[in-house]
Amino acid sequence: MSHYDLILRNGNVVCPDGVRKADIAVSDGKIVLIAEEIPGDAKEIIDAAGKHIFPGITDGHVHFNDPGRTEWETITTGSSALAAGGGVAYFDMPLNCSPCTLDAVNFNNKLAVAQKDSLVDYGFWGGLTSANLDKLDELAECGVIGFKAFACHSGIDEFPRMDDYTALVGMEKLAKLGLPLMVHCENAEITKELTELSLANNRTGVRDYFAARPPITEIENVSRMITFAEETGCKLIIAHISTAKAVELVAQARARGVDVYCETIGHYLYLTGDDVERLGTVAKCSPPIRDGENQLQMWGRLFNDNIAFVSSDHSPCDPKLKNGEFMRVWGGISACQTTLQGLLTHAYHDRKFPLVKIAQLTAQHVNEIFKIKDKGQIALGYDADFALVDLDHEFTLQAEDLFYKHKVSPYVGDRFRGSVSQTILRGTTIYKDGKIVSQPIGKHLRPHQ
């Protein structure tokens, strides 16, 4: 009789080819058997009857701000929040840690913190700016999963924006290195001029902010970045895409063979500009949240498989930085704990979006795109990463439920349908019934070349 480390019995397993009732056996942190019924014994047996077993999610876009801005968030608190939402891995952005991840020294400083403090697995983005073109090779050797650049001002002076020369030379280099570039796409000149004009005329409200960053700023820049990618052969990922027209540009480029993808974020699917007026600065982000008509079209693009993955763009700050006029306060939303629950509520329950596609958007595609081996789906030989979900459990998110350093989110007070009861990383339970139940066991994820 076979003996395993872990058996999950009687669950509804969200596999790449569909949802089916099955048992899952785990040994040495890997999935070794999936069958209707698995005989044998295990060190641990979990009865998952009534639960859906999703692949643990990988959040491709977080700002945990560690080291250097730990008064905003830390790897400890951020990774705990991710686990509470069914997360098993994240890719941390090269800002707003300080110093930014622009060379090997600062990569290794961040790595040392994560090795000590990260509850879940982690990968790191390197930065591409006008000041570090000579550092791309050393960052690639460190094992970055890709590079991040801003076409407009990043919000902090220590991470300069990518000008056209940097885009050309940088993308040529990254094409040779075989690593992707993710770009925050907003036209620098238009956003700068409109913002300055608005401030000069004391127009600092929610709608003034929207007017200073209109859809054309994203649409134009996405088009230009696609042109750079097409000419250089660099794999391109459009960050936090917010307009359906920009998604269409990506789909058209992919149809003609350009290696380009886009991610979107939950708040572009769940919130509208009217919600931002109601919620205030807690819902300020860049690009801004758009109107209801665009949101409806974004859902259409999601159903048509034009969006590769959904991330949180978790970007917290000291709450004091959210006090003041909307135009002037920090832009960023705290959301890494609610990505899966949000999609279960708004996609599956509200719009009958398939569970398999939710698993693809939150786990499978992001690991495939970034060449992370053995992660992102429930299949033989893959890491035993699971989120156990009660699909019909309804709850109201309370501030005290959040594991963030600051208990702040635009979703506090919202009603969700679909909750995570347990998160398992490589066969070890790390979160269960509202509590973190493991020491940090995260490992560094590198692209598999």
From Swiss-Prot:
GO molecular function: allantoinase activity; cobalt ion binding; zinc ion binding
GO cellular component: cytoplasm
Cofactor remark from the record: Binds 2 Zn(2+) ions per subunit.
Pathway linked to the protein: Nitrogen metabolism; (S)-allantoin degradation; allantoate from (S)-allantoin: step 1/1
CDD domains for the chain: L-HYD_ALN
BP-aspect Gene Ontology terms: allantoin catabolic process; purine nucleobase catabolic process
EC number(s) per entry: 3.5.2.5
Keywords annotated in UniProt: Hydrolase, Metal-binding, Purine metabolism, Zinc
Residues that bind Zn(2+) 2: K148, H184, H240
A Pfam family per the record: Amidohydro_1
Record-listed N6-carboxylysine modification sites: K148
Post-translational modification: Carboxylation allows a single lysine to coordinate two zinc ions.
The reaction(s) this protein catalyses: (S)-allantoin + H2O = allantoate + H(+)
Annotated residues for binding of Zn(2+) 1: H61, H63, K148, D313
Enzyme class, broadest EC rank: hydrolase
Cofactors named for this entry: Zn(2+)
Subunit organization: Homotetramer.
HAMAP family in UniProt: Hydantoinase
PANTHER family xref list: ALLANTOINASE
Family: Belongs to the metallo-dependent hydrolases superfamily. Allantoinase family.
Protein task: Catalyzes the conversion of allantoin (5-ureidohydantoin) to allantoic acid by hydrolytic cleavage of the five-member hydantoin ring.
Name used for this protein in its record: Allantoinase
Protein's organism: Desulfitobacterium hafniense (strain DSM 10664 / DCB-2)
